[in-house]
Regions:
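A short, well-ordered alpha-helix in the C-terminal region of glycosyltransferases
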Residues: 194-203
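Short acidic alpha-helix that forms the nucleotide-activated donor recognition element
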Residues: 45-53
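Catalytic cores of eukaryotic secretory-pathway lumenal/extracellular enzymes that build
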Residues: 1-12, 16-19, 23-46
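Catalytic binding pocket for nucleotide-activated donors in carbohydrate/polymer assembly enzymes
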Residues: 52-53, 60-195
């Protein structure tokens, strides 16, 4: 993860992750089976190790906020199943592999934009009316978290989510939890998991063919540039 020095809430989120990692590591019943690891200064070198090892790729930007990233494509081409919002390149992947072969959740871009235009998104109302959402958010300032982390940072993040939540995290939270539960259940079904893993690189869906074509075009262009460079020298 990375965050600009002045991006206070982003730093608070990183602190939340580190605190959660500490809490889980201290739990003797949970720690043998679950780890939370924050990968610092994520870059290409780290990606080369992490992407091939990934089982489920979570691409969970708020719909309408992601222009179009390529990270999800790299995970997908290495056999990871995508779980994400209908945002960025997730939309194209869903169209190519079919809705049955990708886990999507959350509001659409049009719905999110409408909330911004009407200024009618109310995080506090969602927090107060949905017990599951309240339970998740309250855990941020639970005793176990406050004892392990910095209370000022955790309380500031809690207040930001309940009082503002500019990126509408609570809007998609329930849908995310339900969709992830389905993904994990399907992963336990080895035959379903293998079906999804095989589907992604399949030429039937044109994804790999498109990628090969792009790679060949890219390599040809680079080769031309290199040849021209040596001719100049």
């Amino acid at each position: 993860a990375k965050a600009a020095p002045a991006y206070t809430i982003a730093k608070d989120i990183i602190h939340l992750i580190l605190t959660l990692s500490k809490v889980i590591e201290a739990d003797k019943d949970v720690s043998p089976y679950l780890k939370v690891v924050l990968v610092q200064n994520y870059n290409v070198t780290l990606a080369e190790k992490l992407i091939p090892a990934c089982d489920i790729s979570e691409q969970i930007s708020l719909a309408s906020k992601e222009a179009s990233g390529t990270g999800n494509m790299k995970f997908m081409l290495n056999g990871a199943v995508t779980l994400g919002t209908m945002d960025g390149a997730n939309v194209e992947i869903a169209e190519l592999v079919g809705k049955d072969n990708i886990y999507t959740f959350g509001a659409t871009s049009d719905e999110v934009i409408a909330h911004y235009e009407k200024c009618d998104y109310n995080a506090k109302k969602l927090y107060e009316t949905d017990a599951l959402i309240k339970k998740c958010v309250d855990f941020i300032i639970s005793d176990v978290m406050l004892q392990a982390g910095d209370s000022h940072s955790l309380n500031r993040l809690y207040n930001e989510i309940v009082g503002k939540d500019w990126f509408m995290a609570l809007l998609d939270l329930r849908s995310y939890i339900e969709t992830k539960e389905k993904a994990l259940t399907d992963y336990d079904d080895i035959f379903q998991a293998h079906h999804l893993i095989v589907i992604y690189p399949s030429p039937e869906y044109n994804i790999q063919n498109h990628t090969h074509q792009r790679n060949r075009k890219y390599n040809n262009q680079i080769e031309t540039v290199v040849i021209c460079f040596f001719h100049i020298i």
